[in-house]
Amino acid sequence: MVKVGAVVVLYNPNFDVTKKTLSSLASQVDQICVVDNSPSDHSEVLSGYESVEYKPLLKNIGIAAAQNIGIRYFIDLGYDFVLFADQDSIASEKVVDKLLENHQALKEASIKVGAVGTRAINRQTGLPYVEKSNEIRIIDKRVLSNTSNITECYSIMSSISLIPWKYS
């Protein structure tokens, strides 16, 4: 069975939103590692959540360094995938299953994949975010002819993205 761990990085979080983030992930992954870049401890946010590892840093070391702490945690435990989520990202139902299915479809088609992710939707407008300069560049072609939901792109947002450990 595939093991998926989620890394959620905090920085002075809004507790209500962060609880929604954790709740949206809890049933979809095997464990959540919360790495806290805030100058104070926020362990109270995690009360009531099983399978959550809390790593308070008590200083801001940056999102990438904090994500690396979470990655190392799951590598050491032998996990197959890591899912990144921001403290305010609400994962839709079954999103992890869909990302795993897309990864598997690409692997079966012998397409090497570094990460699979979602399209970011603006909560206020309900519309996908559009490209700003060259931040997110999507190639307008479908990767597999038998699916219309996988699109090749040069980069993705880290939040709600799935990273495999073995390059495939």
Give the role of each language-model region.
Residues 7-27:
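Short, well-formed alpha-helical segments that are part of the catalytic scaffolds
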Residues 22, 30-39, 55-57:
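Short beta-strand/loop segment that forms part of the nucleotide-sugar
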Residues 36-44, 59, 89-90:
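A conserved acidic beta->alpha catalytic loop
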Residues 58-74:
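Glycine-rich, basic loop-to-helix element that forms the pyrophosphate-binding segment
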Residues 79-90:
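Short beta-strand-to-loop acidic/aromatic patch adjacent to the donor-nucleotide binding site
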Residues 94-130:
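Conserved donor NDP-sugar-binding/catalytic core segment of glycosyltransferases
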Residues 133-153:
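Short, flexible, basic/aromatic active-site loop/helix in glycosyltransferases
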Residues 157-168:
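Conserved nucleotide-sugar donor-binding
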